[in-house]
Amino acid sequence: MCYMCLTLSITQHIEMGMNKLPTKKRAQVLNLLCEGMSMRAIARSTDVSFNTIVKMLEDAGTVCAQMHDEMVRDVNAKRVQCDEIWAFNYCKQRTVASAKAAHADAGDIWTWTGIDADSKLIISYLVGDRSGQAAIELMDDIRDRITDRVQISTDGHRAYLEAVEGAFGGDVDYGQVIKQYGATPTPAGRYSPAECTGVKKVRVEGNPDDAHISTSFVEVHNKTMRMHMRRFTRLTNGHSKKVANHAHMVALYTLFYNFIRTHSKLRMTPAMQAGIASTFLTFEDVIARIDAAQPPAKRGPYKKKEAA
């Protein structure tokens, strides 16, 4: 199931309303969410209630998904790298059967990204499972956001083969990076990645440049995601407890990464480097969009004034 396009409208998210915090405080909370702090830690640090932070995440995530859809268009990308990163909701997939009160959507959850290798812009993202359908939706979305023929690089996940073919047909240069791994380290129950023992580049479609068949940039970005979103941090209890909020956080982070955060090597935002933005956005801009979507307050009952 794809959670990138959330079913609730902005009005549905926001119409419940709350006593508004000052804009500066709201911007601080959104910034801390994108700087790797958990919601509980933010509540302690800012003296803002946990429930208020959850509501702010829902509102911001919904607005940020819309802003990404509107602004990341007509991207002049020449090389796109795609990958998927693992996390889990409520509990890991292998423990769902034994978990107490596990939700229907508990278990593994995957975030797919397609990144412009030159500008480092996140062109497309998707939160869902690791199925072929998820790969198809990602590739279809990338196709709709770029302007010219592109070289695509992915890992060896078989789901990409049909997805790239279906989205681009023969109008693409596509290569895969196939990694070979050694034996799983012991003890098996302890987290530690297997050692990569070899890498093979495979031409799949068109005429990809072998020198640029690579997933290095998107893999570095995977680490950036884990650093900036607490729910992606391994070996902690900061994991997501609700899939919708996981998707909201990814949407908020994506706008932050593309339009707000200064990229350390580019010295500007990826959106500015890609030519789809001329200046930095701020969290205050996000808050303004949230407030603009809020329905007007209902008028109270009419009270006749008493004669003086």
Predicted segments, located by residue:
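Residue-level recognition of single "structural anchor" positions
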Residues: 1-308
